[in-house]
């Protein structure tokens, strides 16, 4: 496996509100994705995740301190390493920077798994859902 510095680094937000996940259409409008983008020089992964959630989906909120995982993908000959953070959404704007070419959809966890094509991302989310369920059972 290639070293992480041989990948283009990206960060993503997994936006959650009222038990639902926010998805947006990809830049070409053909797939449903979570907000993500390139980590710019001088920016942390968390800052990037929050910025992309705002630009792509019009969402404001707070990230969990630690990422829930990461996944790899290839596109147009480049390899990407995406760090994923859970985002607790506190505000949803009716207008946002990329509104003119992205759709936003709130889906149940089941709907998320039906729409997301990146298998590694789906696995990260599946494990997170299971972990949260176990924590709630332990508290009961």
Task: List each language-model region with its residue ranges.
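N-terminal strand-loop-strand
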Residues: 1-34
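Short, charged/polar surface micro-motifs in flexible loops or helix N-caps
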Residues: 20-21, 28-31, 40-41, 88-93
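The catalytic Nudix box helix
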Residues: 34-67
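Structural detector for helix-capping/boundary residues
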Residues: 37, 51, 107-110, 119
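Active-site-adjacent beta-strand/loop module that shapes the phosphate/pyrophosphate-binding cleft
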Residues: 70-95, 105-107, 120, 127, ...
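Short, charged, solvent-exposed linker or helix-capping segments at domain edges/interfaces
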Residues: 94-100, 115-118
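Charged phosphate-binding loop/patch that engages nucleotide di/tri-phosphates or the phosphate backbone
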Residues: 114-140
